[in-house]
Regions:
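Signature of alpha-helical transmembrane segments and their immediate interfacial
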Residues: 1-39, 366-367, 371, 375, ...
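Solvent-exposed, non-transmembrane loop/terminal regulatory segments of multi-pass membrane proteins
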Residues: 34-78, 84, 134-157, 167, ...
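Extracytoplasmic
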Residues: 56, 62, 130-242, 531-616
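Interfacial segments of transmembrane alpha-helices in multi-pass membrane proteins
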Residues: 217-270, 337-341, 611-656, 726-729
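Hydrophobic, glycine/alanine-rich multi-pass transmembrane helices and their short helix-loop junctions
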Residues: 234, 322-365, 621-625, 647-658, ...
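Hydrophobic transmembrane alpha-helices and their membrane-interface caps
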Residues: 244-292, 633-682, 722, 749-752, ...
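Helix-loop junctions and hydrophobic alpha-helical segments within the transmembrane domains
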Residues: 299-326, 689-712
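Juxtamembrane segments of multi-pass membrane proteins
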Residues: 402-524
Length: 783
């Protein structure tokens, strides 16, 4: 048989296999050292999604919308010479940094006046040099109050809040340099904080993205270390043998290196999901080692011959573990069908990594065991676990004497699961992965309190003609004025920035009084344009709000992080009102921006969970069908796999855990791993029937023979995944806790519910022997 032949090859060509493994591992290690972090925001929506396409078109026309970082301070004693001057110098310092397009505070913002000789507008900043006297401070404050455009954009005079807006260069924004640049921004800000003992607040998409990436980088290394320590501890507890612990760690370590190198070869970068790959592969790979080592030790006790024990180990376990790893890999691979880039990258790499790690285990384990000289008596002693035997005795009692109770409990748990599942929240937030006490969370709430929010939201108005924005006596501008007045009714939105804002500012500059901060009449607008058309735009906000053909314009808002449910309800309310201002037969209006794309992703995830789970169930069922050739057995065997998922969904609902990229993985991972237990049990059960055991006796033997390794595996996986529960990211933490719970439920379902189902329906399904064909029999002669 192929497995026996493989064992012989490994024994005969040990040196060649070692050269092969070591060479690839060294090359892979070099690739791993070149893996980069992803500095772009997670792409959940597929590229062909209508809203994503609109957002992409917007960025190609007007540029990135998430380039603004904001720095704020609340200080009722701000208007003193030292604080004003230091705030001014801080703004200038930030503006001078490489990678920063602009930095502006209300102190460096533009004011202007009309030159009476040229009749053109001339501009200058409020401050060009530090102030010294009280009269200068009073004059400055009075001037600032005279310019309405800056209120609630760069400062909030009623609540004594000042703000600096820092605009990033888009090239720097999406590169590794952003992390160093953020540090360069924070350094002088911290100096200001320390000098005046006043906390500054930071937010905006560049800051939030950097905050996330720093956490990812820190947690990735931390989880790898903790996962390794947990694996060492549990392996030592199980085997009490340093050599066996070292073999297992060596095997999964090579698997991790190969997997990460594969990610590099595929051109993927480290994201919030792919950062989990290394500890995940480590956790999933360890059970392969446990099954092989347990079988090797048992065969060693029986045969007292190392070579024979290795041959029995491979022949007995290889196909079973292959099928189990295939089902686990399918759980990840189905994420490819989501058409979501971040999920596809994770799914492809994880599924291939699982199979690579299995292949490495299959080759490395026999190679290393050839050099291990373990005393037989010691091996026999360490394969006996009294507490597991007691546990399995209790399982046997439940299966053969408490089936009715088991079914009643299963029905009750299922009802609770369905009930809780109805409460699963689809209400996603941009920062709901952060704990409530995280600085990024509290700072965002600060800006929402005083400036409505920091998340970009855009309203695009498209006309049908070139220069359409200014045709028909600039009718579009007056419609935008109505739009802004209408949006002012919604406190979730900040004050807008648009062409109208810039023209109102120019009108005030031209007339010299704040009462002229308004959109002028048509004739006055034409006059203002003609007098200033040959000069540079007097307002830096005009140019970014027009496309090259002057057929499109944008009205930019910031919005609070109100959650996807409220956001969608808000869109449904304001879109018809916008369309009433801009009739569809003449104009096209589009609502977009990073906030809309991100929040739409939440509903997209729900749809893809259902699709990917259905595909996963079908694929794993097909694998089982190849093994057992019985549709009835396959259908029944899926019940113990689905019950843990139902329990998990119920817990998510009752615990108010929302769908997000990390929590959606719970179901794919858990179902794939739960199916492993089903494969282990049914394979053993089928082989016992093949040996000629009676139905009940075959089930009893299967419980005891597979139970020990399944318990070992569950303990390893439980503690491996529970590590993620300590993540500061809410989704990753939920992933770790819920997968751990699901695995325990899957263990109980496979050892209790699955045997109960087989016993109850033994007379209603075809005899198992009918489903055993020569090409599906596992060589279990020595198992």
């Amino acid at each position: 048989m192929i497995w026996k032949y493989l064992t012989q090859c490994l024994s005969q060509f040990k040196l060649l296999f070692w050269i092969f493994i070591i060479s690839i591992t060294l090359g892979a290690s070099y690739w791993v050292s070149n893996i980069e972090m992803s500095y772009e925001f997670a792409k959940i929506l597929p590229a062909d999604d209508p809203d994503y396409k609109v957002y992409s078109d917007f960025k190609s026309t007007f540029g990135e919308d998430g380039v603004l970082m904001v720095i704020g301070v609340k200080d009722s004693t701000f208007f003193t010479a030292n604080k004003i001057n230091d705030w001014f110098l801080l703004t200038q310092k930030l503006k001078s940094l490489n990678g920063i397009q602009n930095a502006v505070s209300v102190l460096t913002a533009l004011k202007g006046h009309r030159n009476d000789s040229t009749l053109k507008i001339e501009t200058e900043p409020f401050m060009e040099s530090p102030v010294a006297s009280l009269s200068e401070i009073q004059k400055l404050k009075a001037e600032l109050l005279n310019w309405p455009i800056y209120k609630h954009k760069l400062w909030d005079p009623e609540h004594h809040v000042m703000l600096i807006g820092v605009t990033f260069d888009s090239k720097t924004l999406n590169s590794a340099n952003r992390l160093a640049l953020i540090d360069s921004i924070l350094m002088p800000c911290k100096h200001y904080e320390n000098k005046y003992h006043t906390p500054l607040h930071y937010s905006g998409m560049p800051y939030l993205r950097t905050h996330i990436m720093k956490k990812i980088r820190h947690e990735m290394m931390l989880f790898i270390l903790i996962s390794a320590l947990v694996s060492i501890g549990i392996l030592w507890l199980f085997f009490r043998n340093f050599k066996m612990v070292a073999i297992s760690l060596l095997t999964v370590g090579i698997g991790v290196v190969w997997t990460m190198a594969l990610m590099y070869a595929l051109g993927y970068k480290i994201t919030v999901l792919t950062s989990l790959l290394a500890p995940l592969i480590m956790v999933i790979g360890i059970p392969n080692c446990i099954f092989f080592i347990n079988r090797y030790r048992k065969a060693l006790v029986e045969n007292q011959n190392r070579n024979k024990a290795i041959e029995v180990m491979v022949s007995s376990m290889a196909l079973t573990l292959l099928i189990a790893n295939v089902t686990t890999a399918i759980g990840f691979a189905v994420l490819y069908y989501t058409n979501s880039a971040i999920l596809q990258e994770f799914g492809i790499t994880a599924s291939m990594g699982v199979m690579l790690t299995f292949l490495i285990t299959l080759i490395t384990m026999p190679l290393v065991l050839h050099y291990i000289n373990e005393p037989f008596e010691k091996t026999k002693k360490t394969t006996e676990w009294k507490w597991i035997t007691l546990f399995l005795n209790r399982i046997e009692t439940f299966v053969f004497h408490k089936r009715k109770t088991i079914y009643i409990l299963t029905i009750c748990i299922s009802i609770l699961g369905f009930w809780g599942m109805n409460y699963i929240s689809l209400n996603g937030y941009v920062i709901d992965d952060f704990p409530k006490n995280d600085i990024a969370y509290t700072d965002m709430r600060f800006f929402e309190n005083y400036f409505a929010g920091v998340l970009p939201f855009e309203c695009i108005i498209k006309t049908q003609d070139s220069n359409g924005i200014f045709k028909n006596n600039a009718r579009v501008l007056y419609k935008i004025k109505r739009l802004e007045r209408m949006m002012h009714q919604y406190p979730q939105f900040s004050e807008p920035l648009s062409l109208v804002s810039g023209i109102k500012l120019a009108h005030q500059m031209d007339r010299g009084d704040s009462k002229f901060y308004s959109l002028p009449a048509v004739e006055d607008l034409k006059d203002l344009y003609e007098r200033n058309s040959q000069t540079e735009t007097p307002n830096p906000w005009l140019k970014p709000y027009l496309n090259a053909q002057q057929s499109q314009t944008r009205v930019s808002f910031q919005i609070a992080d109100i959650g996807s449910l409220k956001f969608n309800a808000l869109l449904n309310e304001i879109k018809p009102r916008i369309d009433s201002i801009f009739p569809l037969n003449t104009y096209t209006t589009v609502l977009t921006g990073h906030s809309r794309v991100f929040l739409k992703s939440q509903s997209y995830l729900q749809q893809n969970l259902i699709e990917s789970l259905i595909i996963e169930i079908i694929l794993i069922a097909l694998v089982g069908l190849l093994l057992f050739r019985s549709l009835s057995i396959i259908v029944l065997s899926k019940l113990p796999c689905l019950l843990p998922l139902l329990i998990t969904a119920g817990i998510m609902g009752f615990a108010d855990i929302a769908f997000k990229p990390s929590t959606i993985l719970i179901f794919s991972i858990a179902f794939g791993i739960s199916s492993d237990g089903t494969v282990y049990f049914l394979t053993r059960f089928r082989n016992e029937i093949k040996r000629g055991l009676k139905f009940h006796e075959a089930i009893r033997v299967s419980i005891y023979e597979t139970g020990q390794s399944m318990v070992f595996t569950t303990i390893i996986l439980f503690f491996g995944f529970i590590v993620f529960g300590f993540s500061s990211f809410g989704g990753t933490s939920a992933l770790g806790i819920l997968v751990s719970i699901t695995l325990v439920m899957a263990l109980l379902a496979n050892l209790i519910l699955l045997p109960c189902i087989l016993i109850s329906l033994q007379n209603r399904i075809k005899p198992i022997k009918e489903h055993i064909t020569p090409n599906t029999i596992i060589d279990d002669e020595h198992h």
